[in-house]
Amino acid sequence: MASYDFIQTDSELASLVALLRRRERIAVDLEGENNLHSYGIRVCLIQLFDGHRGYIVDPLAIRTKDLLKELFEGSGWLKVMFDSTNDLLALRHELGIKPSSLYDLAIAAQLLHRPGGLHALRDGPHSARAKDRFQKSNWLRRPLPEAMLDYAISDVLDLLDLADALAADLAKEGLTAEFDRRNRERLDKVRVWDPLGNFTRIPGFQRMRRAGRERAKTLWYAREYYARLHDLAPENVASKPQLAKIVELGLRDGEAIARLLNESRQRNRVDPRDFGRLLADAERDAERNTETLARRGG
């Protein structure tokens, strides 16, 4: 395990930004929260490795968020990442950051027909078992156990070596230009988090009649509003199968819906008054968004 510095203050981060300006490329990874333990998308840790030493930045402890922006946008070094899609979305959504450069190893692996994720490219011990151990960890908790910090930094330690190996294979196969094109396309893509747009994931949605679909959409909105108000993961308010059940039973008011959701539930019990109030807001907003799409021809 390489040595690493844990960056938790603005002054430490400012010094790191100045230091990394002298580097040509840095391996980067994020640990985040995505509607698993609380509401929304959060950047919880930023892991960096310059080929010699590792750095873990705690963005929750940084007061001057512009320093985080400077780290990713004001630096000239190449950001070497693996499967950056979710990380780029999190940076953009929470911090308003769009990295100035990118080298995504997942694109290279795809072009070279090497499936299986990052652990499949590795020969070391940091494989799927280690990933599974921390897959659902709460990265918002503080202080973080040393084992979680060690795991976090381990995810970037071999990215630069992998980048060299994959770049050589791309060149050998004549795929460098195609990699550059796809890599630039991923970096330039506009990313917007739209939690209200996923109501079609409710089981059986496509088989519902029009009234059922409209009700499912309203319930999805209400679930999002309640989760945001109480800082809960939406699935801890109502699972997607529960939403489908509510539609099937024709439940219309907050009291009846909360009663169903709270069956056999000790934690995260749904407040019927809050849900009923938000359900009214959801009905209005869902109808308004449907009308807007209709006017646009969507």
Question: Model-predicted segments: where are they?
Answer:
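DEDD superfamily 3′-5′ metal-dependent exonuclease/proofreading module
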Residues: M1-C44, L48-G298
